[in-house]
Amino acid sequence: MIQMQSRLDVADNTGAKSVMCIKVLGGSKRRYAGIGDVIKVSIKDAAPRGRVKKGEVYNAVVVRTAKGVRRQDGSLVKFDGNAAVLLNAKLEPIGTRIFGPVTRELRTERFMKIVSLAPEVL
């Protein structure tokens, strides 16, 4: 469960290491984001020669949460931390690699590219 001011790790090779959620997209009173939701993030920590710089604002999709996601069969998939993948204005991934597992809930038409790049889909 991600809300404003939440810190997330970055699960791609854009050069960003840590981001902070500054807005949950999808409605004026929307408070929380879960796996597969698009959020607006600010880069808080970045590698020196990465594609992105500290302080820049991007869209991102949440790929892992400590809260987890409940499946139709009753199982619950949780992770150790929260992670996101940075997106451009067209909601396409900026990076060319994804680190760590992602969930099957991302297998929508919007994020098939992320699922295909991921090393493991849970």
Curated annotation (Swiss-Prot):
Disulfide bonds: none
UniProt cross-references to Gene3D superfamilies, sorted A to Z: Ribosomal protein L14 (2.40.150.20)
Pfam families: Ribosomal_L14
SUPFAM superfamilies linked: Ribosomal protein L14 (SSF50193)
HAMAP family hit by this protein: Ribosomal_uL14
Family: Belongs to the universal ribosomal protein uL14 family.
Protein name: Large ribosomal subunit protein uL14
Native species: Leptothrix cholodnii (strain ATCC 51168 / LMG 8142 / SP-6)
Lineage: Bacteria, Pseudomonadati, Pseudomonadota, Betaproteobacteria, Burkholderiales
